[in-house]
């Protein structure tokens, strides 16, 4: 029997070893399968979190014609929601302010000449020639020491009644709206150690090229505000920003009813804004998007209504052209008439984008409107 046992043992041992290997291989496959399932669950959970985040994200698109105040509004969002401008940004704004002053003053000197307005002081002819000789073809930043060389001429020119008269006729040519503010503050801005204040930053004018975004959080709700250039050459970029938007803030410069576009020097600026608004508000892409009209530059409108009749440029106006309430009502009606879908009201606000408290107050109301209209399933409290 012992021989049989030994024979059986020799036959059985290899079979047992092979079974163990098979059991180990099967166990490894099951482990790999469990790991694959775990990874799949992790990926699904991550994708679900991302989808929830996308649904929660409030994406606001700033649209409107050039120089309507979109970039200023975006800067206000940074200021209001606590994101300070760093040293690099301050230096860039300083460069922009120097450029605004030099270019704006050159425009005034040239306009005085073309409009045939005499100098109050004949010696300012030399100051004007000195300023007109300034060239910056390379577009390099103007250093404070260089800018200081022009400050005496700039100050003398701004005091001259000839330049002031040209400024009073600025609707007849293209002049940045911040030029007066900067020239009034020339003593401060002309210092070697000058750095822009928040108000200076808000008034610094540089055309937006491309797409600028700002992210902030309100009551745990993430907001993304997107600014794209409003000039005609920049509008083809708008379509890159349409995906996933929650709301459109459409900005209009309410005071520009007597001005023409810089691009063609022919089209009335308010008419251009109405045409763009009509295209946006009736686009099927935005049927479920809240569109809020911001009639901006209220501070300038208040002053302009006193002296410039809107009826001269818009003959269908009915009312007192020098009564602010009548002009405001007409402006809202002009844009409201462009809407083909009358099922929803037109939300609108008169704003002054350079006034931080005004923007803070208006955006608080706008935020509630946006969330009520588009994010009813999100609890803010």
Swiss-Prot record:
GO terms for molecular function: D5 dopamine receptor binding; G protein activity; G-protein beta/gamma-subunit complex binding; GTP binding; GTPase activity; metal ion binding; protein phosphatase 2A binding; protein phosphatase activator activity. CDD domains: G-alpha. Gene3D superfamilies: GI Alpha 1, domain 2-like, P-loop containing nucleotide triphosphate hydrolases. Mg(2+) binds at residues 71, 208. GO terms for biological process: adenylate cyclase-modulating G protein-coupled receptor signaling pathway; blood coagulation; cell differentiation; embryonic digit morphogenesis; G protein-coupled receptor signaling pathway; in utero embryonic development; negative regulation of vascular associated smooth muscle cell migration; negative regulation of vascular associated smooth muscle cell proliferation. It holds the Pfam family G-alpha. GTP binds at residues 67-72, 202-205, 296-299, 353. Residues 200-208 are annotated as: G2 motif. Residues 292-299 are annotated as: G4 motif. Residues 351-356 are annotated as: G5 motif. One of its GO terms (cellular component) is lateral plasma membrane. PROSITE patterns: G_ALPHA. A lipid is attached at residue 11 (S-palmitoyl cysteine). It is found in: Cell membrane; Lateral cell membrane; Cytoplasm. Coiled coil: none annotated. G proteins are composed of 3 units; alpha, beta and gamma. The alpha chain contains the guanine nucleotide binding site. Interacts with UBXD5. Interacts (in GTP-bound form) with PPP5C (via TPR repeats); activates PPP5C phosphatase activity and translocates PPP5C to the cell membrane. Interacts with RGS22. Interacts (via N-terminus) with NAPA; the interaction promotes CDH5 localization to plasma membrane. Interacts with CTNND1 (via N-terminus); the interaction regulates CDH1-mediated cell-cell adhesion. Guanine nucleotide-binding proteins (G proteins) are involved as modulators or transducers in various transmembrane signaling systems. Activates effector molecule RhoA by binding and activating RhoGEFs (ARHGEF12/LARG). GNA12-dependent Rho signaling subsequently regulates transcription factor AP-1 (activating protein-1). GNA12-dependent Rho signaling also regulates protein phosphatese 2A activation causing dephosphorylation of its target proteins. Promotes tumor cell invasion and metastasis by activating RhoA/ROCK signaling pathway and up-regulating pro-inflammatory cytokine production. This is Guanine nucleotide-binding protein subunit alpha-12. The gene is GNA12.
